[in-house]
């Protein structure tokens, strides 16, 4: 069995990597990938904590987090597809410009 600290450290490292990808990248697709990594890191923390205390709540929260990530990915990818059709660019700087 993996100790609680090792699992939580791994989850924290994954969360920081996802947050770094979200903050540094300017492409919306890579920002969406960073957000997915952050959601999976929090789900990993739920599973590790539930395993440590012998509760099934961690697995239930993992299923909830995975369904949330799937819904977020499907909506996000649909929006990215429409944005790419209209602008031919997924750069966040060019998308945030207002036309008037």
Curated annotation (Swiss-Prot):
It comes from the Bacteria. Gene3D superfamilies: 1.10.287.3510. It is found in: Cell inner membrane. The chain crosses the membrane at residues 4-24, 28-48, 60-80. Its EC number is 7.1.1.-. GO terms for biological process: ATP synthesis coupled electron transport. Its main location: membrane. It holds the Pfam family Oxidored_q2. It catalyses: a quinone + NADH + 5 H(+)(in) = a quinol + NAD(+) + 4 H(+)(out). GO terms for cellular component: NADH dehydrogenase complex; plasma membrane. Keywords: Cell inner membrane, Cell membrane, Membrane, NAD, Quinone, Translocase, Transmembrane, Transmembrane helix, Transport, Ubiquinone. It is a multi-pass membrane protein. GO terms for molecular function: NADH:ubiquinone reductase (non-electrogenic) activity; quinone binding. Disulfide bonds: none annotated. NDH-1 is composed of 13 different subunits. Subunits NuoA, H, J, K, L, M, N constitute the membrane sector of the complex. NDH-1 shuttles electrons from NADH, via FMN and iron-sulfur (Fe-S) centers, to quinones in the respiratory chain. The immediate electron acceptor for the enzyme in this species is believed to be ubiquinone. Couples the redox reaction to proton translocation (for every two electrons transferred, four hydrogen ions are translocated across the cytoplasmic membrane), and thus conserves the redox energy in a proton gradient. PANTHER family: NADH-UBIQUINONE OXIDOREDUCTASE CHAIN 4L, NADH-UBIQUINONE OXIDOREDUCTASE SUBUNIT ND4L. Belongs to the complex I subunit 4L family. This is NADH-quinone oxidoreductase subunit K.
């Amino acid at each position: 069995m993996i100790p609680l600290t090792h699992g939580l450290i791994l989850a924290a490292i994954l969360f920081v990597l996802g947050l770094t990808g979200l903050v540094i990248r300017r492409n919306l697709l890579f920002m969406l990938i960073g957000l997915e990594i952050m959601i999976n890191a929090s789900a990993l923390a739920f599973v590790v904590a539930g395993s440590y205390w012998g509760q099934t709540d961690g697995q239930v929260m993992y299923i909830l987090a995975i369904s949330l990530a799937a819904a977020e990915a499907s909506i996000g990818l649909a929006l990215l597809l429409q944005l790419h059709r209209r602008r031919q660019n997924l750069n966040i700087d060019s998308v945030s410009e207002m036309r008037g």
